[in-house]
Amino acid sequence: MLHQIFRFNWKAWRALSAAEQQRITTAAINKLKEIAQAPAEAITHQSALYSQLGHKGDLILVHMRNSVEALNQVELQLAQTEFYDYLEQTYSYLSVVELGLYESTAKTYSALAARDIEPHSETWNAAIKETLDRQAAAMSSRIYPTIPEAKYLCFYPMDRKRGEEVNWYMESMADRQRMMHLHGMIGRRYADQVRQIISGSIGLDDWEWGVDLFANDPLTFKRLIYEMRFDEVSAKYALFGSFYVGVKLPIENLTAWLSGNLA
């Protein structure tokens, strides 16, 4: 999963003739549609465009692909367009969609311990793999999600604290499982209002996770995140990066956007 944040050079764009603007825009729309078109063999292949609010940028592109090579190919394809000459990438984020499996992991570990299976032994590893494979098959729609059609996007990266006094990774599995369960219960109350995609980025980018929230009412983002501020996981262990909010921009509406309109 790749997020690209761009600032648009409006001054340089306005210096072009109407004919040049139209030519560049048409080529950009065609290229973006080509990039978003999924090949038949792709498990997940999507790209979505958003008009960004605030000073951090003007456009957000979100890409979901099967591999980092495919994501890099998207970057290279975009860079070949003349439209790209008017974009300045101010931020990007690379991650992989993942599921929180604290509860199922705790149950699996307990079951293996009850059978006196030595942790990390060959038997242990085989049992863990079998469990993960079974869960992956059952939850494939969550592992390979589609980008929702919701009108608004809120993206932010985050960490779990690992300081000298407060360190998430030094807590026991049982305590982490308990806290994440309570944390998840808050999210479930908003399930009919917001769609969430969590992606992991340890070893891939500067933060540990990326969070994408999709909703048809932007105030839902505020209500959900505010309520979670009082949850132990967030209040005690969470660190948040910058927030990026955008309005869904269908690719064919790029012409209108370049004229100062969302539609």
Task: Identify the function of each model-found stretch.
Residues 37, 188-192, 222-226, 233:
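Charged/polar positions within long, soluble alpha-helices
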Residues 174-208, 219:
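Intrinsically disordered, low-complexity segments enriched in Gly and acidic/Ser/Thr residues
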